[in-house]
């Protein structure tokens, strides 16, 4: 779900072309991207891509081709995977499960009615990412020579930490939580850049990447990072989705400016969760992160990629080999005056 502070972010978000990120390291929220691929890469009736054994492969399809697109533009992606979810998130995970169950029911009903448009919308809400699917995604990245990081807990917190350290230029995620975790820079729409159809409408829109600078966001609204986190908590986060009763973004912004002190603010509102807001504040300000990672980009192992995608999951041999040729060509084209070592080493 993520925190909904779009109202605050919109005035400072800047659209750019994907090529703007050439030569930049982007710490991408892996789960966020994989779920987007699972939601968008589907057949007309909403069915995801499947291999001969019935295993879902939409996530691998998106990860493979989108990552090659990044590298063709000179972008240096590093994918950050979630670790153990915080205990505070348990109720939200249960809520998401129930949403998927209800969506599956509505999907089946839409299929029975022959309403493929409605079926596809509900199908997108049923996406599940299993341990086996995550394992295959990591294998694919390893074989492609693209680094990934295993966060101890929240992937967005780890990505934000890497940007703060200077190991990455920006966090890449659709969710605004990255800003609450303190990422100096957030890039949205990376995984969905291009033409996208609007739900229930025969209308296509061009989706472009957008950049949000944390410092500018805070300056424009006259708040501190801690106050931004408090606003997010009041509006609702993954740890307490309901937030404070009757509090929207505008009212939350007014409260943090008037009362300033988080304890006073939390005492002044009707809290709708049994999770103490102080604990959520602590989690955002001091998340669990690690320095145990290495950002090294290597040459792809074409045979291993073919073994995983073509032999195990029945991808088209022609499409995969053509894509791998593009990957090799992209490295030579963009960095022909550098040795592979000088580019692939951060």
Swiss-Prot record:
SUPFAM superfamilies associated with the record: 5' to 3' exonuclease, C-terminal subdomain, PIN domain-like
Keywords, comma-separated and alphabetical: DNA damage, DNA repair, DNA replication, Endonuclease, Exonuclease, Hydrolase, Magnesium, Metal-binding, Nuclease
Enzyme Commission no: 3.1.-.-
Tagged with keyword Metal-binding: yes
Record GO biological process: DNA repair; DNA replication, removal of RNA primer
Cofactor binding, per record: Binds 2 magnesium ions per subunit. They probably participate in the reaction catalyzed by the enzyme. May bind an additional third magnesium ion after substrate binding.
Cited InterPro entries: 5-3_exonuclease_C_sf, Flap_endonuc, Flap_endonuc_arc, HhH2, PIN-like_dom_sf, XPG-I_dom, XPG/Rad2, XPG_CS
Residue span of region Interaction with PCNA: 336-344
Annotated positions binding Mg(2+) 1: 29, 82, 154, 156
Subunit structure of this chain's protein: Interacts with PCNA. PCNA stimulates the nuclease activity without altering cleavage specificity.
Protein name as annotated: Flap endonuclease 1
Organism field: Thermofilum pendens (strain DSM 2475 / Hrk 5)
């Amino acid at each position: 779900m993520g925190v909904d502070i779009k109202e605050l972010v919109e005035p400072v978000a800047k659209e750019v072309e994907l090529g703007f990120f050439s030569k930049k390291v982007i710490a991408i929220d892996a789960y966020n991207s994989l779920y987007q691929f699972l939601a968008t890469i589907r057949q007309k009736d909403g069915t995801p891509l499947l291999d001969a054994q019935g295993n879902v492969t939409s996530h691998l399809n998106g990860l493979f081709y989108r990552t090659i697109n990044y590298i063709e533009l000179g972008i240096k992606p590093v994918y950050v995977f979630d670790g153990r979810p915080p205990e505070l998130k348990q109720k939200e995970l249960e809520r998401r499960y129930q949403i998927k169950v209800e969506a599956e029911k509505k999907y089946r009903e839409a299929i029975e009615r022959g309403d493929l448009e409605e079926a596809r919308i509900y199908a997108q809400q049923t996406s599940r990412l299993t341990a086996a699917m995550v394992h295959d995604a990591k294998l694919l990245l390893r074989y492609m020579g693209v680094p990934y990081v295993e966060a101890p807990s929240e992937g967005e917190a780890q990505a934000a930490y890497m940007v703060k350290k200077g190991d990455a230029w920006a966090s890449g995620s659709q969710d605004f939580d990255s800003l609450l975790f303190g990422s100096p820079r957030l890039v949205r729409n990376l995984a969905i850049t291009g033409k996208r159809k609007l739900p229930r409408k025969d209308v296509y829109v061009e989706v472009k990447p957008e950049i949000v600078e944390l410092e500018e966001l805070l300056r424009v609204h006259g708040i501190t990072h801690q106050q931004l986190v408090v606003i997010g908590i009041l509006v609702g986060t993954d740890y307490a989705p309901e937030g404070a009763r009757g509090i929207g973004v505008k009212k939350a912004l007014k409260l943090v400016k008037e009362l300033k002190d988080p304890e006073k603010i939390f005492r002044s509102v009707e809290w709708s969760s049994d999770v103490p807001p102080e604990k959520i504040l602590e989690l955002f300000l001091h998340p669990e992160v690690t320095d145990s990672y290495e950002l090294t980009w290597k040459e792809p192992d074409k045979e291993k990629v073919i073994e995983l995608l073509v032999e195990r999951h029945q991808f088209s041999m022609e499409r995969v080999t053509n894509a791998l040729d593009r990957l090799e060509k992209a490295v030579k084209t963009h960095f022909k005056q550098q040795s592979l070592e000088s580019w692939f080493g951060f």
